[in-house]
Structures are given as structure tokens and as C-alpha cells.
């Protein structure tokens, strides 16, 4: 039985044509969905939007490795910010946080390979990977305490971090396993 991680045969941190192609597809999808949903804000937050498509970041990391996951999150969020706000790097730390979430989710198939022997176990692991990736990756936004100290700890915690990890964790826990269930038969047909 095969595993979902392309990192098993190519190396976890390999940057191959395949990784770049999958990352480009994922980043393009993520950017377009970011652009289409940026106006749907969670009330009482610091411009945190509802993003059910966040599961794309964790899926691409889980399915294609940590490099692809990072690129989908970072590039997709950067391009999405440019499309939505006209400023690709105005909040670069959010793009890095999105990338780190995909990277962390991409490490789970390496760490858990021996436990993912069935499609259902891979799907369940992908949900956990998505939630853990979100919680860990978005810790990076705390750099705002240095960059924008006027926001303060409480605003970052209650207006940004908690709403972001709640919304994105829900999306990752639902969307990532659905995409794993959809991708696995295609992957086997393609011989990937």
C-alpha cells in the first residue's frame, strides 16, 4: 500500500517539478478563493475573514509535502492579498503563517506514515494535521507584538489569533479529509 507523501521517495524537503506544479495549482486556487471571500469578515475581529477554503493549504501540505504546503499557503495568501487589498506584502507575516500551517500539515505523513495504512486513517490523520498545522503555523502572527506593538497582546489574542485558528481549524478539519478522500483514488489512477 502506498502513502500520500511524495516525500517518501523524493525526500521530504525536495523541490521537484512535481512539487512546484502542485504548489502552483494550490496557490492559484487559494489566492482566487481568498479574493472571493475577503469581504466576509468575522464580526468583532481585526479583519479576520471566513475562509472555508483554508483546507486547501493543509491538504496540499499533507498530500504533496511540507514544501508544497508552505508554498500554497505563502504564495496563495500573498497573491490573494494583492488581488483583494492591492498590497501583496502589507501583512507579510500572515502569509508566512499560512505557509507554516501548510508546512506543519505536510510533516504529518512523514511522522505518521506507519499509522496511515488505510484511506480512513489517512483522512483522519489529515484532519488532525490540519488543526495542528493551523494552531502552530499561526503562532507566527505574534510577531505583530514587535511590528505593531500598538495592537497589544489582548487585541492580537482575541481579535486575530483565536478567531483565525478557530475558523481555519474548522475548515481544515472538514475540508482536508474530504480532499484526501477525493484525491486518493485519482492519485492511484495516476500512479503517484
What spans do the regions from the language model cover?
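Hydrophobic core segments of transmembrane alpha-helices in multi-pass, intramembrane catalytic enzymes
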Residues: 53-57, 97-102
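Short, charged juxtamembrane terminal tails flanking transmembrane helices
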Residues: 1-9, 185-192
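Membrane-embedded alpha-helical hairpins and interfacial helices in multi-pass inner-membrane proteins
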Residues: 38-54, 85-93, 111-192
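Hydrophobic transmembrane alpha-helices
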Residues: 2-63, 67-68
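Interfacial segments of multi-pass membrane proteins
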Residues: 64-65, 76-86
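Alpha-helical transmembrane segments of multipass membrane proteins
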Residues: 26-34, 76, 80, 101, ...
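Central hydrophobic cores of alpha-helical transmembrane segments
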Residues: 69-78, 126-133
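Re-entrant/interfacial helical elements at transmembrane boundaries that shape
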Residues: 42-43, 57-59, 73-77, 177
Amino acid at each position: 500500500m502506498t502513502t500520500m507523501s511524495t516525500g517518501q521517495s523524493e525526500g521530504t524537503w525536495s523541490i521537484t517539478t512535481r512539487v512546484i506544479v502542485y504548489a502552483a495549482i494550490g496557490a492559484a486556487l487559494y489566492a482566487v478563493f481568498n479574493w472571493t471571500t475577503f469581504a466576509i469578515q468575522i464580526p468583532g475581529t481585526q479583519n479576520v475573514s471566513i475562509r472555508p477554503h483554508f483546507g486547501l493549504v493543509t491538504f496540499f501540505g499533507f498530500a504533496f509535502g511540507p514544501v508544497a504546503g508552505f508554498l500554497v499557503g505563502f504564495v496563495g495568501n500573498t497573491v490573494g492579498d494583492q488581488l483583494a487589498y492591492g498590497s501583496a506584502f502589507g501583512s507579510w507575516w500572515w502569509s508566512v503563517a499560512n505557509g507554516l500551517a501548510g508546512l506543519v500539515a505536510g510533516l504529518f505523513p512523514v511522522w505518521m506514515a506507519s499509522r496511515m495504512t488505510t484511506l480512513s486513517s489517512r483522512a483522519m490523520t489529515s484532519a488532525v494535521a490540519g488543526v495542528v498545522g493551523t494552531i502552530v503555523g499561526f503562532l507566527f502572527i505574534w510577531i505583530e507584538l514587535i511590528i505593531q506593538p500598538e495592537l497589544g497582546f489582548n487585541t492580537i489574542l482575541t481579535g486575530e489569533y483565536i478567531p483565525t485558528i478557530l475558523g481555519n481549524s474548522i475548515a481544515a478539519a472538514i475540508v482536508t479529509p474530504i480532499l484526501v478522500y477525493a484525491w486518493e483514488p485519482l492519485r492511484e489512477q495516476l500512479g503517484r
